Structures are given as C-alpha cells and as structure tokens.
Amino acid sequence: AEVKSCISVSGNSEMLEAFELLKKALEDNNVENLEWGYRATFGGATVAMDCPPYEMYYSGSQIWQQTQDLADISGMYKAYGIAMEENATTTRWDHVAVELEFLHFLTYKLAYAIENHSEEEQESCRSGKKKFLYAHIGRWIKAFSTSVVKKTPEDFYRQAATLATIFVHKEMVRLSVDAEEIDEYMGNEPDYLQRLEGKSASACDSCMDEEKYD
C-alpha cells in the first residue's frame, strides 16, 4: 500500500500500471513457482548465459576493464557506508538486485536529507545516484529487462524487470543522466567472471555435469 501510494503521488501512470501487474503476478503465485521460475530464467549453480543477472556480462569489457568496473562498484558502496566482505571471492557486487538495492539506499538517504534540510548530504546522494546511473545500472538495465521478458516463463520476473526498467529510466530523466545504454545482451562471457565462478555458465545446470575446468 505504501509503495502504491508513493507511485500514485508521483503521478506516473506507467509505473503504477507496472506495479499493479507485478502485485497481481505475486498474489497469484507461490514460493515453489518463483524458485522454479528463477532457476529457469537466471540459472542455478551456474549462470544462465542467455539471461545473466550481472552487469559485467553485458559490458563485454576486457579483463582490465572488468576488474576496474567491479572495483568502482565496490568503491561506491563503501563510500556510502556499505561494508563489503573482504575475503569472499564469489561476492558479486554487480548483481542486478544488489545494484537496485543500492539505488534504493541512495534514494532513501536523499529523501532523509531533504526532510532534515541537509544541503551537503543532499548533494552527496544526488551526485552518487547520477554517477551510479550513468556508469552502471542505467547502462544495462534495458538489455537485462529485454532478456528477462524474452526468456522467463514466470510472469512475476517479467513484471519485476519491466518495473525496474521504468523506474531507472524515470530517475535518469529526472536527474538529467544521459547514459550510454546497452540495448541488447550480446552473449558475452567475460574471462574474469568465468574464472571467478570457476567454470562457464549455462541455463541448464545438468548440462555442466561433464564439463571440466582447470
């Protein structure tokens, strides 16, 4: 009810419609279906290569750029007081859920700063949001959403991806962020991520059973 109220106040009919569809998809569902739908869309023990939920798969960058981008993401989290695990080699800071949560965190901090008349904090949060939208989530959310809509058998994930894209793009317009967007996922598998995860990825875990990697 609170989320719907906030969207209604904004007067954004497109976002409100997307939220209502997401809400309905959740109400008509259960945990088992959502778990199955997640694995079918994003993979399980391995990443689904036709719909990865990680930024680095969409950038198609060289290894030096991949490590720099991941370091930049981690650095932004730390700059705003979010602690990262130092020794967890499998920690993925570029997961779409983590990046969207960070965007929510900055939005909340900005709202708090506005309410408490902190001009310096407002500028810090606004600047952080603009940078994160421009360099990270704003670049690949469209391609990610398109991949999800095409692949997922579960309407909940289709509507969630659609709502996320609408929200991110509305924020980009509001903050005058002109990111160089990736329109479509091209099936990249960055070398760095392959080594990070220990093996190549497939939409079907069983397909990986006989594959061996050094």
Kindly give the residue locations of the regions a language model identified.
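Surface/interface-facing alpha-helical segments and adjacent flexible terminal/loop regions used
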Residues: 1-214
